[in-house]
Amino acid sequence: MELAERFLLDALAYLECALGVVCYVLLKLVGSPYGRYASSGSAFGLPARAAWTVQELPSLALPLLACAGAGAPAERLNRWPNCILLAMFLVHYAQRSLVFPFLIRGGKPMPLYAFLLAFIFCTYNGYLQSRYLSQYAVYADDWLSDPRFLTGSALWLIGMLINIHSDHVLRNLRKPGETGYKIPRGGLFEYISAANYFGEVVEWCGYALASWSIQGWAFAVFTFCVLFTRAQQHHKWYHEKFEDYPKFRKIMIPFLV
């Protein structure tokens, strides 16, 4: 049974990588029709705050259930590396499901299909990461001092802080009573159009490096594929919307792309 589930977790990780590539191609073709790109006549729109909270919850609930030993004792969570890595995952999704939605100002309705896809992914990936770390991931006794873990943990923290700060910048572009869109200023937005996405990609690449597993890297690959296409869409939109948009700004990676 354990061998079969371990094989399943590896297969799901490789599938997540493949799905990331598929999503990249599809989103390049059709774009991401939610948020500012959603049609005003879209049917079955869900309130933004409620949609964000519910769609992200599986990635918070499943690790918590793993910690509680629901279904099977969390055999590997008696090891510090496993606990810290799972905590990284938990902290991110606690912020995304319990804090971020309630900071949203206004927010266009979320199309039902976008909500369902996000909910399915958070369930899929939440199971993959939490089950692997709680039951199967084995690390050396000195893993906490390994350069991969230290570097990855630092990148995770830096990426999360960039993501949170960039979201704060975006929320405060408009003063009370103002409507419409503005050019983001400050922080990494001085260099790239999608600083919030860059932060999240750095965060999960750091997590992947610290976990040193196909499960962790699958999440990082999927995140990059989805967010980079969204960043390209933003970058193009900004240039079309604002004649004075800074020409030197890159899409998502400072000074490069």
From Swiss-Prot:
Record EC number: 1.3.1.22
Localization terms from the record: Microsome membrane; Endoplasmic reticulum membrane
Gene Ontology, cellular component aspect: endoplasmic reticulum membrane
Topology with respect to the bilayer: Multi-pass membrane protein
Pfam families, per the entry: Steroid_dh
GO BP terms: androgen biosynthetic process; cell differentiation; sex differentiation; steroid biosynthetic process
Keyword Amino-acid biosynthesis: no
Enzymatic reactions: a 3-oxo-5alpha-steroid + NADP(+) = a 3-oxo-Delta(4)-steroid + NADPH + H(+); 5alpha-pregnane-3,20-dione + NADP(+) = progesterone + NADPH + H(+); 17beta-hydroxy-5alpha-androstan-3-one + NADP(+) = testosterone + NADPH + H(+); androst-4-ene-3,17-dione + NADPH + H(+) = 5alpha-androstan-3,17-dione + NADP(+)
Annotated transmembrane regions: 7-27, 50-70, 84-104, 109-129, 149-169, 208-228
Keywords assigned by UniProt, alphabetized: Differentiation, Endoplasmic reticulum, Lipid metabolism, Membrane, Microsome, NADP, Oxidoreductase, Sexual differentiation, Transmembrane, Transmembrane helix
Coiled-coil regions listed in the entry: none
UniProt-recorded Gene Ontology molecular function terms: 3-oxo-5-alpha-steroid 4-dehydrogenase (NADP+) activity; 3-oxo-5-alpha-steroid 4-dehydrogenase activity
Top-level taxon in the UniProt lineage: Eukaryota
Described purpose of this protein according to its UniProt entry: Converts testosterone into 5-alpha-dihydrotestosterone and progesterone or corticosterone into their corresponding 5-alpha-3-oxosteroids. It plays a central role in sexual differentiation and androgen physiology.
Protein family (similarity comment): Belongs to the steroid 5-alpha reductase family.
PANTHER family (alphabetical): 3-OXO-5-ALPHA-STEROID 4-DEHYDROGENASE, 3-OXO-5-ALPHA-STEROID 4-DEHYDROGENASE 1
Protein name, per record: 3-oxo-5-alpha-steroid 4-dehydrogenase 1
UniProt source species: Bos taurus (Bovine)
Protein encoded by which gene: SRD5A1
